């Protein structure tokens, strides 16, 4: 018996390994069955695979709220239920209390206008173009040092030895925190991702999530106070002293922004770099073409974002009765914006499943669109471009014989957790 579309969506929600690795046929089938939108009982949301409809939602924040981008209310309930039980543990009571207070606030990717507009105005300067241009030599230097550690071996796990570390080192330097605590920051970041795309996290996972948020807030609250008294040229200082029309951000807005900078500043770029590495290790013709003409690398990065971006989909909730291409949608109903599917919509581009760096224009939505266009997209593109060039410098790059694909345990984020490769050993760089 063939599974229904909703059965297959339920399998995706349950993080079926086959669907996490390759959701493309499911998305094509949903698109074909949609007229023009498909309501999934399993997800409790309209599944949006159309680039046109997704764009329509993204440019209308008054109708489509971003208050719960990573889960419907139903899927948030298990986290709340576990939190209620965890609160009875004496050592976790204060952490849970703060968690509840944070959950009531909305910052950046959970905020809507006018709050979101005010927050973005205050924080946009943190990722201003001149700062990113000045970072390019530093990103290249960090990249070279990471490659130097494994280049003589002729073998590496490009995810764990490169894709994880490059964005983690860079966001730590931009924040202005000690690099000798990278493991702590990475642990926090990984825990922050626990509720993202796991419909039913365990109690232990929720405990780790709440504990890490508490520890993060304790640590960064001290640094924010220090930067208010003695500002530096770093992200913490930007956040600590940000104002709009003379009004400073609230403490929760500062902490929320810093948490999101840490998470988005490494998790999504790590997945992008891993996908780039896999493409280069499996497509020799493309690799040779890029190696011969490095001016093509930016277009390669854009096609990597379209073809296999780091975010599979995010939720929006209707603030009033509306419609999706003629399908009535009631106030309070959710829509799951499948960015990965919209980027392969045949209406957007011909032969969408082919990887083609000559696509122009490449109107992908890997970084979103409109009000919530990714604030850190410039940094991600910079790191991806440097990373792609570094991988092109690995002679005869191929997948290792013992490589087996493994993907993140999430239906929201999609990326490899390892990438074993081989190449001709390099004894000296530069």
Residue ranges of model-derived segments:
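Cytochrome P450 catalytic-core helices
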Residues: 254-260, 266-289, 375-395
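Conserved cytochrome P450 catalytic core segment spanning the I/J/K helices
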Residues: 128, 134, 210-270
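Cytochrome P450 proximal C-terminal region
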Residues: 27, 381-430
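Active-site substrate-recognition loop segments, prototypically the cytochrome P450 B′-helix/B-C loop
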Residues: 1-159, 171-186, 190-203, 207-211
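Conserved cytochrome P450 K-helix E-x-x-R motif and the immediately C-terminal K′/meander segment
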Residues: 24, 291-327
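Conserved cytochrome P450 K-helix/beta-meander segment immediately N-terminal to the heme-binding cysteine loop
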Residues: 340-362
């Amino acid at each position: 018996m063939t599974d229904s579309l909703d059965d297959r969506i339920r399998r995706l929600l349950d993080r079926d390994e086959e669907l996490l690795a390759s959701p493309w046929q499911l998305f094509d089938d949903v698109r074909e069955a949609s007229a023009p939108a498909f309501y999934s009982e399993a997800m409790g949301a309209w599944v949006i695979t159309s680039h046109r409809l997704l764009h329509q939602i993204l440019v209308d924040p008054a109708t489509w709220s971003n208050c719960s981008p990573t889960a419907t209310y139903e899927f948030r309930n298990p986290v709340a239920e576990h939190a209620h039980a965890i609160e009875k543990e004496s050592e976790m009571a204060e952490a849970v209390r703060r968690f509840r207070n944070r959950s009531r606030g909305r910052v950046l990717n959970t905020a809507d206008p006018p709050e979101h507009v005010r927050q973005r105005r205050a924080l946009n300067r943190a990722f201003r173009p001149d700062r990113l241009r000045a970072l390019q030599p530093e990103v290249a230097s960090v990249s070279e040092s990471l490659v130097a550690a494994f280049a003589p071996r002729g073998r590496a796990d490009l995810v764990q030895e490169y894709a994880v570390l490059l964005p983690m080192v860079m966001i730590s330097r931009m924040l202005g925190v000690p690099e000798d605590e990278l493991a702590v920051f990475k642990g926090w970041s990984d825990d922050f991702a626990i509720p993202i795309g796991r419909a039913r996290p365990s109690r232990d996972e929720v405990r780790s999530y709440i504990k890490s948020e508490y520890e993060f807030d304790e640590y960064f609250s001290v640094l924010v106070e220090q930067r208010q008294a003695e500002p530096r040229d770093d992200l913490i200082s930007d956040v600590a002293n940000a104002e709009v029309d003379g009004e400073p951000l609230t403490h929760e807005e500062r902490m929320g922004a810093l948490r999101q900078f840490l998470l988005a500043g490494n998790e999504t770029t790590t997945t992008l770099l891993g996908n780039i590495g896999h493409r280069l290790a499996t497509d020799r013709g493309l690799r040779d073409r890029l190696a011969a003409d490095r001016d093509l690398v930016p277009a390669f990065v854009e096609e990597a974002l379209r073809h296999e971006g780091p975010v599979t989909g995010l939720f929006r909730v209707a603030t009033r009765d509306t419609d999706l291409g003629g399908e009535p949608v009631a106030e309070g109903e959710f829509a799951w914006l499948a960015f990965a599917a919209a980027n392969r919509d045949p209406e957007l581009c011909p032969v969408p499943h082919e990887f083609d760096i000559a696509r122009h224009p490449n109107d992908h939505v890997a970084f979103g669109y409109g009000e919530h266009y990714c604030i850190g997209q410039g940094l991600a593109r910079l790191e991806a471009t440097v990373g792609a060039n570094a991988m092109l410098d690995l002679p005869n790059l191929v997948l290792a014989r013992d490589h087996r694909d493994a993907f993140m345990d999430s239906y929201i984020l999609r990326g490899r957790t390892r990438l074993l490769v081989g190449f001709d050993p390099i004894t000296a760089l530069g």
